[in-house]
Amino acid sequence: MSRLLKKRFKIINSKNGNIYKIKYFSKINNEIYINNILPKKKKGWIFHLTNTCNLFLIYGKARILLVDKKTNKIKKIKLNINKYCNNVVVPPKKWFALENLSNNSEAIFLNILSGKHSSKESLKKDVYLYKKFVT
């Protein structure tokens, strides 16, 4: 019988909920993350220069906030594992944030990134500073 492999997730600590890197595919250059968001918290703003985020809500109810550059307004896409769509593809060069709508349970997203995450490839702003950085 072959031996079982046991691996640890890389955990990226965040005050509004942790991120768990679960896989990096070197042959196709993709990464997969699990992103949990604590009740009534937001994460973002995030802007990827080249990567696409394929976000799947796998637990809870949440919404994705997207900045529309043309109108300078926030588009809100509600996600609920039981009622609404639970997948949103965020293309490169688009500011977005994640918001947990629950009062008492976390929201969990699976994020399949189209490339390798790098601090040089993405920009981040505090989620509560939207009006200060959108032009």
Predicted feature locations:
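Non-catalytic, conserved peripheral segments adjacent to functional cores
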Residues: 1-86, 103-135
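Short beta-strand-centered segments at strand-helix junctions
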Residues: 88-93
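Asparagine-centered strand-capping/turn motif at beta-strand->loop junctions
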Residues: 98-101
